[in-house]
């Protein structure tokens, strides 16, 4: 990493970087890594093998700010959340602009056996592309707990695209914390991102899942992914759209995990802060996904390492966790636009759950649908979904498409998804152009018959699903 900030447009290609004593890299401190642009713009890190970092492999993270560095550790008179809000605003003072920071490309790297994260970064990774990386065996030694551990852990992943990555055997797969605005996770293969059953949870550690989106306002787009771990998405957030995914794990932490925290949202496709708000939950969309109860449906219990406590988490797959959330019609009916606004009367509405949309989803093997699901498909037939590996290639062994037969959904696009509530930003490309979900997991074209899940054709199930091109 450069010793100073602002050293931009560097290419790091074809290196082997291993065994470095990097330091713990939380979001409100200087974020160290074995490789990183150190608060600059336009780096390319490609075709590298990055391994055995004591903490982070690649850091796209925060610069050193002496007045805010490790504030809570050293002073703790402000809450950790407040110091992070301070860090966002101070970052704008210190040049956190699209023209100066971010827009990196991280591609085709083999990142493994790092103990905090494969790729981490607070604010410095905005507008970046993270693609075709093989990220695996992160935090397997379990020497470190704390809320910063994942294959990819990004704060403020504004307009960041993470696509075609193969992430497995990590304590957590991808963690988008705060300001996952314009973030898109697409065509990724995630599996085995869970601790062994005997492993206890370290002090400060988190539960395991393929994806965690935390205290954001959206729009966060998760499409055409294969999610095979026992927990697919930890949902302590709002403004998420899940489209054309194969989801074999539970949606956890729905309506929970945010407390009173209020976090920033931004001008569309910019870093400038537009506002702050608590997480109301909801404002979520589910279209053309396949939900499979692959794992046991009983709540999962994780014992603590540092005390006699434990954590319990849902493992029942499906959208049923949103049963208490309103449809759009139910939500909008609370506002009478023919009368003058009554601030006091609307107070409870303004702080209640936002609406949810769910259509064209498939629920198999006991997975349960939201009570307002439209055009859904539910089957009690026995379903198998197994991932097998041979010579570096990965294949799905499944009978899903035999059960689906002729069922189909409609073509989904930006117009269908609409805008995320707080930032009033469409689910769209970083350049503001609309998205039509007519391209599948393999890059193939979806035709007039739209099959739920990540594949355009049922015959695609026999293809190698490891489309990551890392060596």
Give the residues covered by each predicted segment.
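Glycine- and acidic/polar-rich repeat regions and solenoidal domains
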Residues: 22-38, 54-410, 415
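Extracellular beta-strand-rich solenoid/capping regions of secreted or surface-exposed proteins
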Residues: 1-11, 27-40
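Active-site-adjacent substrate/metal-binding segments within catalytic domains
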Residues: 11-26
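Active-site and glycan-interaction determinants of carbohydrate-active enzymes
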Residues: 409-448
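Short, surface-exposed, low-complexity cationic segments
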Residues: 448-471
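Transmembrane beta-barrel wall of Gram-negative outer-membrane proteins
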Residues: 40-48
């Amino acid at each position: 990493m450069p010793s100073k900030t602002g050293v931009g447009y560097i290419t790091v290609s074809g290196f082997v970087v291993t065994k470095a004593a990097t330091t713990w890299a939380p979001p409100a401190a200087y974020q160290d890594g074995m490789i990183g642009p150190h608060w600059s713009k336009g780096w390319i890190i490609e075709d590298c093998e990055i391994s055995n970092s004591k903490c982070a492999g690649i850091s796209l993270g925060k610069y050193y700010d002496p007045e805010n560095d490790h504030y809570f550790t050293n002073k703790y008179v402000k809450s950790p959340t407040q110091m992070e809000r301070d860090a966002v605003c101070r970052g704008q003072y210190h040049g956190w602009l699209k023209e100066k920071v971010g827009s990196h490309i991280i591609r085709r790297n083999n990142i493994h056996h790092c103990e905090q994260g494969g790729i981490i970064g607070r604010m410095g990774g905005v507008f970046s592309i993270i693609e075709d990386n093989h990220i695996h065996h992160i935090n397997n030694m379990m020497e470190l707990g704390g809320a910063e551990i994942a294959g990819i852990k990004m704060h403020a992943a504004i307009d960041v695209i993470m696509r075609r990555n193969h992430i497995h055997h990590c304590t957590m797969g991808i963690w988008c914390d705060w300001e996952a605005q314009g973030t898109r996770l697409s065509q990724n293969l995630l599996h085995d991102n869970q601790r062994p059953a005997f492993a206890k949870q370290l002090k400060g550690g988190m539960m395991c899942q393929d994806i965690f989106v935390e205290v954001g306002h959206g729009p966060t787009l998760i499409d055409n992914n294969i999610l095979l771990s026992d927990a697919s998405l930890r949902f302590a957030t709002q403004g998420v759209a899940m489209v054309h995914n194969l989801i074999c794990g539970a949606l956890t932490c729905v309506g929970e995990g945010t407390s009173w925290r209020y976090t920033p949202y931004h001008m569309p496709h910019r870093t400038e802060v537009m506002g702050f708000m608590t997480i109301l939950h909801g404002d979520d969309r589910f279209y053309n996904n396949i939900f499979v109860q692959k794992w046991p449906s009983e709540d999962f219990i994780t014992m603590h390492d540092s005390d006699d406590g434990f954590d319990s988490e849902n493992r029942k797959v499906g959208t049923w966790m949103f049963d208490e959330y309103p449809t759009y019609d139910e939500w909008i009916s609370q506002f009478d636009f023919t009368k003058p606004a009554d601030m006091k009367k609307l107070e409870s509405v303004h702080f209640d759950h936002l609406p949810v949309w769910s259509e064209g989803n498939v629920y198999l093997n006991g997975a349960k649908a939201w009570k307002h699901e439209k055009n859904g498909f539910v089957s009690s037939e026995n379903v198998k979904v197994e991932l097998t590996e041979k010579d570096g290639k990965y294949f799905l062994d499944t009978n899903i498409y035999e059960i689906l037969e002729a069922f189909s959904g409609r073509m989904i696009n930006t117009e269908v998804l609409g805008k995320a509530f707080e930032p009033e930003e469409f689910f769209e490309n970083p350049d503001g152009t609309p998205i039509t979900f007519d391209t599948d997991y393999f890059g193939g074209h979806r035709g007039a018959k739209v099959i739920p899940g990540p594949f355009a054709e049922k015959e695609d199930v026999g293809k190698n699903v490891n489309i990551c091109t890392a060596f």
